[in-house]
Amino acid sequence: KIKMIGLDLDGTVFNDNKEISEENKAAIREAAAQGIIVLPATGRPLRGLPKAMLEIEGIHYAVTSNGGAVYDLDSRKAIYEDCIPNEEAKQLVSVLNAVDGLVEVYIDGVCYAQQSRLEHALTYPLSKPFLEYIWKSRERQEDLEAFLTADGGNVQKMHLLFGSTKERQRAFEMIAPYEADLAV
């Protein structure tokens, strides 16, 4: 008997326009009605989970931040976390400030980004639905490194976006000394 179904969201359950079909919703509802745990699994933070998914009756848990956290959706509390310690995250942000890219940190189910870099990321050659999602779902900070110092929370995930493969490669070279402790 099937006990659990894990579902990737973007590009799988949701199409490239970030929409879910009625057919997919019905299949998810049917599985949940049969007592099967339906578990969305995504790179998104808790706050970035699509409303259309959360409104489907019978979904009680979600794997978020690429496995950085598992949430009980009824209580909105993390029941598991595998975080990057705050000090390490601050070091990485400091190092990555030298590249032309968007650095994001996910803390307690929310994604934070530096305002100036978020604005610049809108010029990257990415799909319009993706850019809209990023713009709408990020909490903007004047200075991400200072925010990490003030917040003190551990980081469920770090996400990087670049406008060019050259900058991406530069960033990977800069964080190479940290890779033993990270999933890159």
Spans of features found by a protein language model:
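Short, Lys/Arg-enriched, disordered terminal segments
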Residues: 1-2, 33
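Asp-based phosphoryl-transfer active-site loop
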Residues: 2-18, 92
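Flexible loop residues that form catalytic
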Residues: 10, 67, 163
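Active-site phosphate-binding/coordination module
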Residues: 22-127
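Conserved acidic, metal-coordinating active-site core of Asp-based
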Residues: 95, 99, 106-184
